[in-house]
Amino acid sequence: MQHKTIMDKIIIQGARENNLKNIFLEIPKNQFVVFTGLSGSGKSTLAFDTLYAEGQRRYLESLSSYARQFLDKVGKPNVDKIEGLTPAIAIDQKTTSKNPRSTVGTITEIYDYLRLLFARVGEQFCPTCLEPISSMSASDIISQICHLEENSKIIILAPIIKDKKGSFNDKLESLRLKGYVRAFVDGVMVRLDEEIHLHKTKKHTIEAVVDRVVINSENASRIASAVEKALKESYGELEVEILQDNAPSIRKHYSEHKACFKCKMSFEELEPLSFSFNSPKGACESCLGLGTKFSLDISKILDPNTPLNQGAIKVIFGYNRSYYAQMFEGFCTYNGIDSALCFNELNKEQQDALLYGNGTEISFHFKNSPLKRPWKGIIQIAYDMFKEQKDLSDYMSEKTCSSCNGHRLKASSLSVQVAGLKMADFLTKPIEEVYHFFNDPTHFNYLNEQEKKIAEPILKEILERVFFLYDVGLGYLTLGRDARTISGGESQRIRIASQIGSGLTGVLYVLDEPSIGLHEKDTLKLINTLRNLQKKGNTLIVVEHDKETIKHADFVVDIGPKAGRHGGEVVFSGSVKDLLQNNHSTALYLNGTKKIERPKFEPPKEKHFLEIKNVNINNIKNLSVQIPLKQLVCITGVSGSGKSSLILQTLLPTAQTLLNHAKKNQSLNGVEIVGLEYLDKVIYLDQAPIGKTPRSNPATYTGVMDEIRILFAEQKEAKILGYSTSRFSFNVKGGRCEKCQGDGDIKIEMHFLPDVLVQCDSCKGAKYNPQTLEIKVKGKSIADVLNMSVEEAYEFFAKFPKIAVKLKTLIDVGLGYITLGQNATTLSGGEAQRIKLAKELSKKDTGKTLYILDEPTTGLHFEDVNHLLQVLHSLVALGNSMLVIEHNLDIIKNADYIIDMGPDGGDKGGKVIASGTPLEVAQNCEKTQSYTGKFLALELK
């Protein structure tokens, strides 16, 4: 009986990793389990750093001795015992790939099956004339020639050389020895027994005359013999010249290979590599399969509205005495151009000469020496200036490849069709449309029985994988979408879909907030997908704050009661029904006892708007929208409706560029913004890491580390030893541990496995050498200080205002639990975003800032959301404007104004379908067909 209990449960005994307080917990297997609790309470520590880490360690133990030699260095989680643990797979929010060749299709392997489908049953078309491509047998060719007009005079030719450079004496001699009398050389018939001289540096075409014959029934066998001889001589190809009286002759091309007889082009047999943009067989030769090319961007080299002599040409000005600046002055003098004019004020001829050169020699002085040089134009000058450094990044832009139009493949591959659609069609359609296409078997009725048999298993695999993507709410994405551009939440749901497709059973899946980035409309679809994964015989542990996900769980574990040192305990474990009867923080929000309510602030007396006009990007077409200033405005809508396109890809870069150039109410790239005079800066607080190395941490990012180093350097012992502030930096030699160079960890290369970070055995993770650690403030070394939580450090430095004020802002945004020296790479996206928000709070406020945040509630418990809402409204109360892209209804219902995009994602989105106060959007939801409004109406009841 005891054995059965262990097998049915995962039993954790004595978990003490990070802030966990000797946890004992039993988790039922093969169920949907949710871990919840405040940010920093220890949920992720228990789920990822304990359960998943131990599962991985046990997996490594099962490997060969070569892999096991590293196990002493790979730390075991601080836990006494875990029983009943099954193989573990973690699906977190990290972006899937940084490789520009990775797409949604390649990650999910759907593209591999599409390549196979196109290679096996694809119909080839000529990319030039769009005619079908076919191959012919020798008997087919003979039959077609014999059926030419009766008594036609024809010449049967064997192509030997096609448009190649060389003298080809050996080829001509070989034809003579084989008994050929005549040949066509560059379109002219010559006798092979005469001397033929070909220029070896020019391209030539040589065709052997196999026979000259008249079309009639008597010559049928002769024609057949000549055709077979020609095909053998030219490896499956031949030409027929039909002679006509009083008219030019007609040429016909025949081939045993796949060919377009109209364009006289041969094509290789299709194989999966023909559709791989990572292979020379399929990749576009211009962009090498990337779909984009980098080229010089004139707008980055030249400011058309700045006088030429005042730095308009960014690539050469700033170096007033430089070689190119002097040459430019000579160019202006020679061409009679007034350098006080702007580029836009020059005529077309002058503009072209300036940009592209005009070949004229320019006289100028450089270092007191007269020089004469041809003016190449500033674009060529830019290339010349940076040829050695090979760094043109500041002056270049990534643009769609004009050869393949961004589709990455060769023209011959892009012209192949399956069911009337090309590969590019499948890669650019929303996944929802691709799913419906493959779900309709009538599209493939045109295939013959053999082709259907080949296609059937491939179509089944494609349909399954596409359905799983559609089922997790990713129907708006495309298979060709660059993997680098998808969010952490999207990336996680892609991997969930891939796992369902893998069909694994008996696995422990650990997921980190899979509902991130999902509209309420799609949350139930995600829950059903997770259920499908669980029903295959797997255990799901989901770290989550979403109400719906928690309510649909089989078992809930609530970690708390607070964050950091005040957390690390299991405050509840059991069913949702029992949870709702509890009286701790999570239960109070779920059963409605406690609610998130907006703070009371006076609304602005003056109403100003920021108006964006003529937005055309992705699925947004010719959109204009007004955004109220000095308010908390939420941009809402289902995934893929155009929120990020409108705000992050249009408003943000356009407003920043115009404000940086002090240009109010002007347009950029066709987009016009009205109302910028009410702002002095636009700040985007994203979820990108605050640093990419172990030496980046909250203390260094917020600037509090500088004040701490000053304080340590002011200690009496430090002054006696002559230690400056740099002694207490782990970024430079002197005070840091040189074995790990101030990282605290050392990277171990695992070769066939991911690299592992292990604690430095010299400094034991302290980052500093022993001499530096001897300097103490109130009995604590600088390493001790970095190991403190923000909350502990705030109490410790209470009498040091310069330090305390910066720490207070971190507490204000709900980050009192993180440690000052926490490695930046271990912080979640939500934590990184709030650290950036804290840094902004510590700066002097102008009251004219537009803050843009993308899903700031990521990783936040209800209590933390309440806290964040107070901070956002406090910034608005100072006169600033807050623009938040958000799905969380607790933030949306407490906003001043909502702009809802939709009605759906992808091609069905891109419009503003509702706007107004939360109450107005909710009341008009039936009329506007706003999903946000419908859920808001339920929330506001």
Curated annotation (Swiss-Prot):
CDD domains: ABC_UvrA_I, ABC_UvrA_II. It is found in: Cytoplasm. Gene3D superfamilies: ABC transporter ATPase domain-like, ABC transporter ATPase like domain, ATP-grasp fold, A domain, P-loop containing nucleotide triphosphate hydrolases. Its main location: cytoplasm. The UvrABC repair system catalyzes the recognition and processing of DNA lesions. UvrA is an ATPase and a DNA-binding protein. A damage recognition complex composed of 2 UvrA and 2 UvrB subunits scans DNA for abnormalities. When the presence of a lesion has been verified by UvrB, the UvrA molecules dissociate. Belongs to the ABC transporter superfamily. UvrA family. Pfam families: UvrA_DNA-bind (PF17755), UvrA_inter (PF17760). This is UvrABC system protein A. The keyword Nucleotide-binding applies. GO terms for biological process: nucleotide-excision repair; SOS response. Residues 316-585, 605-937 form the ABC transporter domain. ATP binds at residues 37-44, 637-644. A zinc finger (C4-type) spans 260-287, 737-763.
